[in-house]
Structure formats: structure tokens, C-alpha cells
Amino acid sequence: MYRSACDCDLYGSISDQTFLGYAKEIEKKFGVVWKDVVTRTTGLTITQSGLPITAYFFSSSGGKTELAINAWGSGRTYTQIVDDPGSLDLTLNPRFVSWSRDVPQSVIAAAFILPDVVSLEILGTNESGTVAQIQATSSSGVQVVLRGETFRSRTKIPSAWFSLVSVQN
């Protein structure tokens, strides 16, 4: 949706990693750096074979970037896994270097479209370390497998870079 107030197509939500505009520009710690980067890149377009790319953004990677196929389900030749040490720096990334979430059983069951979940199992991880697939089993024995990113999105956890600590019913 185009917004004339900011001359942008951004949303102030997780879908665009929260567009901050002027609030970011006047921030004392990083505002000057942010404004400089925006100014230096104004008018630039990232292309591949002469066509604009979809440029993905994320705030924290868990130490490595992700391939588009793993994050969004479709491949892009220009996305590669690279080390991202800044995501593991407690000073730069205090909220997501390490995180813990309690997700209610009802939310997990809804994520898998099951009436209940009695067990969860991570079936595999991607090269970046994110969960590739996770399986839930209901009390009636029905098993459903989701992509790690689908599970992350449906349960509203911060990342597909997670491990299971315990399951409580």
C-alpha cells in the first residue's frame, strides 16, 4: 500500500521490520549512521541480470544468514549463507543473541492444525542452523510436519533458529 505521507510502500509492523523513519533519524546513538547510509544509497537499485531483485531484510540472523528457499520457500540465486557475527554480539543485539519463549500448547496445536500436541520433534536443520522441519504428534497419533519458518510464523517466536527445551501438557 502506498503512503503519501512518507512516499513509501512500507508498513510499520513486522512485515517491514517496523519502518521508523524520522524517529530513527533523530536517535542519538545510531541516527547519524542510519541517515548517512540512507543518504548514500538513495536512488540505488540492486539488480540481477538488469532486473530489480527482492531485497530481503532481517534484524538478527542467529550468526548466519539464510537462503531464501529456507526462509520464504522460493530460491533466489543472490541469497547465500554468510557469517553474521554482529547477530551474536550481546552489545549490538541484546534481545536476540539468546532468547527463550514459552509457547502454550494450544498455540502449538493450532500451528499444526491439530486438536492437541503430545510431542514435538525437530526432524532436521538447514545449513545455516535454522530448523528445516519440525513434526508434531497428537494424542490420537496423527503426525504433521511443518517447515521451521512456517512454525516460527504461526507461533510468533522470533526466529527459526531454535531448539526444544521441554514440552508440557
Range-by-range predicted roles:
Residues 1-169:
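Conserved, single-site charged/polar hotspot
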